[in-house]
Amino acid sequence: MGNAIREKTIHGIAASSGIAIAKAYRLETPDLAAEKRAVADVEAEVARFEAAVAKAKEELEAIKQHALEKLGEDKAAIFAAHLLVLDDPELLNPIKEKIQTERVNAEYSLDETASFFISMFEAMDNEYMKERAADIRDVTKRVLAHLLGVTISNPSLISEEVVIIAEDLTPSDTAQLNRQYVKGFATDIGGRTSHSAIMARSLEIPAVVGTKTVTAEVKNGDIVIVDGLDGQVIINPSPELLAQYEQKRARYEAQKAEWAKLVHEATVTADGIHVELAANIGTPDDVKGALANGAEGIGLYRTEFLYMGRSELPTEDEQFVAYKTVLEQMNGKPVVVRTLDIGGDKELPYLQLPKEMNPFLGFRAIRLCLEMQDMFRTQLRALLRASVYGNLKIMFPMIATLDEFRQAKAILLEEKEALLRQGVAVADGIEVGMMVEIPAAAVMADQFAKEVDFFSIGTNDLIQYTMAADRMNERVAYLYQPYNPAILRLISHVIDAAHREGKWVGMCGEMAGDPIAIPILLALGLDEFSMSATSILPARAQLKQLAKEEAARIKETVLSLGTAEEVVSFVKRTFSLA
């Protein structure tokens, strides 16, 4: 190759499917070094700080509005949270006090105070608090830039086709990406559940994150391939490799076009058995994407987004409107609503809950709702009032004991009877089920099945709790094994127990849309697969090629294997999966 630019491949995490090929555009982080200096007029310095905060708020309001229009309500909620940071006296007051008592400049005071909070939150073994650290970092950069008179790069101004290369993309960066020009991105840090990855999937922009070194390897103008299918970034590919990737991209686009033909079809296996494919959603805005991707129902409506990014609890009427909107848009298709699942990795500052040593095993979800019954009853009333507008099913999260389920259902029935006495219409025969995400509930599924109308298996938590491994902790992430036979045996036990009582079983964890899991779950008898909207059509195409009777023959073998690796190898071999 002589002195030609050398091709290089970097590996990362496939965060958003697709293949992007374009020139590199490095999104540089400006120098926001905050040097310490003494100030004579502390009140003027406080005023300068407040002016910078006001300007940052204006920018965030504009970005929030842009996100609302382009990405939907739950993505815009990120910026509502940023605005709350800029109104938080626990952050702002110490900054002002530091300026006044130490007579130092606003930049230094902001940087020191924010760094303290960021370090504190990042040290917590809690993904939600780590995300709050990211929020504070993003907001701090914006205010610092105004104080220093530095311009923060604005991705919305990009006017040619590019692949963005960055250490990380802040939520505000990602919300400003223009799909017309930004064909993909690659970052040094991040994971599949980071803000930037979630937004990339919403925008359907190919992305590879967590490469560690992409910013060190890529220069502006380099030709870059972002392979969001296999988690690779290829820098300055050879003409031969470029041609191969053009073909790979064309095949992927052709495959997507084939999947699109299945939008209005029911999901029927090769031997004529109907399986329901549903979508997981967070807000009413997500219904449009679910229907566009052929969802036969909503298998999980996460209601906590209604409670987040605000300073007080949502009212009964606010919730009623949200639930009614979803039910009406789904036009009679089933909508499974999970009652409030707050705590653990999702906190509400206005509830002022005490900090816990281990929040994932603590006061959260149904445990919190059964104690804070006024809040719980408000949500249940809103759901019951909305029930007449569609096909509502209600499920309770984090159930560990029969007593918890009975207590939650009793409260639901009390609220239903109270509404009926007031002359408020409530639908008949609303199915009431529960999440199976605690091993105790899975083991006792035969007893629960006598009392519930359905189960929804939440594999994300069920795997964590069964394997005693936090999937966000890189050092033990190897133990997060969806295909571990222990997990598969629990799932099989739950499905068999439900079917013996004539009840149906869904799954709403990430596993439900995994191509390797799909034949296993079909073999185990799963009735409903609920997944992110963009996974529905590929799953439908796969299920149409599978015969349930044939898949059922692998059940005994799969459950008899000893390791996750053996399971994956066997399934790939049996069903010719890559």
Curated annotation (Swiss-Prot):
Gene3D superfamilies: Phosphoenolpyruvate-binding domains, Phosphohistidine domain, PtsI, HPr-binding domain. GO terms for biological process: phosphoenolpyruvate-dependent sugar phosphotransferase system. The keyword Oxidoreductase does not apply. Phosphoenolpyruvate binds at residues 302, 338, 460-461, 471. InterPro entries: PEP-util_enz_mobile_dom, PEP-utilizing_PTS_enzyme, PEP_util_AS, PEP_util_C, PEP_util_CS, Phosphohistidine_dom_sf, PTS_EI, PTS_EI-like. GO terms for molecular function: kinase activity; metal ion binding; phosphoenolpyruvate-protein phosphotransferase activity. The active site is at residues 195, 508. Keywords: Cytoplasm, Kinase, Magnesium, Metal-binding, Phosphotransferase system, Sugar transport, Transferase, Transport. Signal peptide: none annotated. Its cofactor is Mg(2+). Homodimer. Belongs to the PEP-utilizing enzyme family. This is Phosphoenolpyruvate-protein phosphotransferase. The gene is ptsI.
